[in-house]
C-alpha cells in the first residue's frame, strides 16, 4: 500500500514538472529590464534551471523509448538493432580529445548545435506518430512535451550564451527540417525509423545534460570536473 501511494505521489510530481515551464525566457531579455516578462536571474540560477530542464528531458526520453519498445519493437528486433552499430550522428559537433582542452565556449555552442539539430526531427516525429492506429496517449503526450520543452531549452541556452559570452544567437526554425523526416515508404520502416530517432535523441539528450553539468562544474571551480 505504501509503495502504491509513493508511486502516485511521484507520478503527480512528474505531471507537475511536465506542465511547469522551467526555462524559456524571452529572447529579447536584457540585464537592465525589469518586470515579470524579463525576470532578473543570476547566472548560477539560470544554469541550474537549464540543467534541471535538461535532466527532465533526458528522463522523459528514456521513458518514451521504453514505451515505444514495449508497444512496437519485439525483443528480437531490438537485439538486431543493437548489434547493427551506432546509427546516430549529430552534425557539426567535433569530438575533443581531452576534457581539459574543451573551452566553455565550445561547450555552449556544441550544446546549442545538438539542441537545434533535434527541434525539427521531434516535430516530424509527432506527425508520423499521429498516424499510428494504436499509439498510447502517454507516448504521444511525452513526444509532444519533449518537442515543446526542447525549444524552451534552446531559448534558455541562448540566454546563457548571451550572459556568458556576450553573443546574440538566433533561435532555429523547426519547420525548415520537417520535410526530410515526415515521409516514410511504409509503416514498418516508419516505425523502425521513429524508434531509431527516439533512441538517438535519448543519447543526445544525455550528451546535452553532460555538457551543461561540466559547464556548471567549471563555474564552481571544482577539481572533480574530470569525472565528466
UniProtKB/Swiss-Prot annotation:
Keywords: Disulfide bond, Glycoprotein, Hormone, Secreted, Signal
Keyword Disulfide bond: yes
Chief place of localization: secreted
Signal peptide span: 1-24
Glycosylation site residues: 141, 177
Subcellular location as annotated: Secreted
BP terms from Gene Ontology: animal organ development; growth hormone receptor signaling pathway; positive regulation of growth; positive regulation of receptor signaling pathway via JAK-STAT; response to nutrient levels
GO MF annotations in UniProt: growth hormone activity; growth hormone receptor binding
GO CC, alphabetical: extracellular space
InterPro entries: 4_helix_cytokine-like_core (IPR009079), Somatotropin/Prolactin (IPR001400), Somatotropin_CS (IPR018116)
Highest taxon in the source lineage: Eukaryota
Disulfide-linked positions: 29-38, 88-200, 217-225
PANTHER family to which the protein is assigned, alphabetical: SOMATOLACTIN ALPHA ISOFORM X1-RELATED, SOMATOTROPIN,PROLACTIN
Family, per entry: Belongs to the somatotropin/prolactin family.
Protein name: Somatolactin
Organism: Anguilla anguilla
Native organism taxonomy: Eukaryota, Metazoa, Chordata, Craniata, Vertebrata
